[in-house]
Amino acid sequence: MSDLDIQIPTAFDPFAEANAGDSGAAAGSKDYVHVRIQQRNGRKSLTTVQGLKKEFSYSKILKDLKKEFCCNGTVVQDPELGQVIQLQGDQRKNVSNFLVQAGIVKKEHIKIHGF
């Protein structure tokens, strides 16, 4: 009776496999431009654009986006994500169309997140 297999329960991490191959996946994930929406207070929202190539002038892109969509925005330096463009309002579809028409990013390299 002493030959019982007893398994001790341990903490299960569902993302362990995804994080294990992080070194190779990080280079591939940089190819995408992520357009997200963040809820602020009430009906207010914030659109963020992340993952643009570093050789682009973020301030010039922001200036064109603000002029095109009649909204305010800023470029934020994030320690983890790098430079991120923030725009007021839900501008996800507008931003993705603008980036494709301007030739900055191909349509298949844009990922839209939110709601």
From Swiss-Prot:
<dbReference type="GO" id="GO:0003743">
    <property type="term" value="F:translation initiation factor activity"/>
</dbReference>
<comment type="similarity">
    <text>Belongs to the SUI1 family.</text>
</comment>
<dbReference type="GO" id="GO:0006417">
    <property type="term" value="P:regulation of translation"/>
</dbReference>
<dbReference type="InterPro" id="IPR001950">
    <property type="entry name" value="SUI1"/>
</dbReference>
<comment type="function">
    <text>Probably involved in translation.</text>
</comment>
<dbReference type="GO" id="GO:0003723">
    <property type="term" value="F:RNA binding"/>
</dbReference>
<keyword id="KW-0810">Translation regulation</keyword>
<dbReference type="InterPro" id="IPR036877">
    <property type="entry name" value="SUI1_dom_sf"/>
</dbReference>
<protein>
    <recommendedName>
        <fullName>Protein translation factor SUI1 homolog</fullName>
    </recommendedName>
</protein>
<keyword id="KW-0648">Protein biosynthesis</keyword>
<dbReference type="InterPro" id="IPR005874">
    <property type="entry name" value="SUI1_euk"/>
</dbReference>
<dbReference type="Pfam" id="PF01253">
    <property type="entry name" value="SUI1"/>
</dbReference>
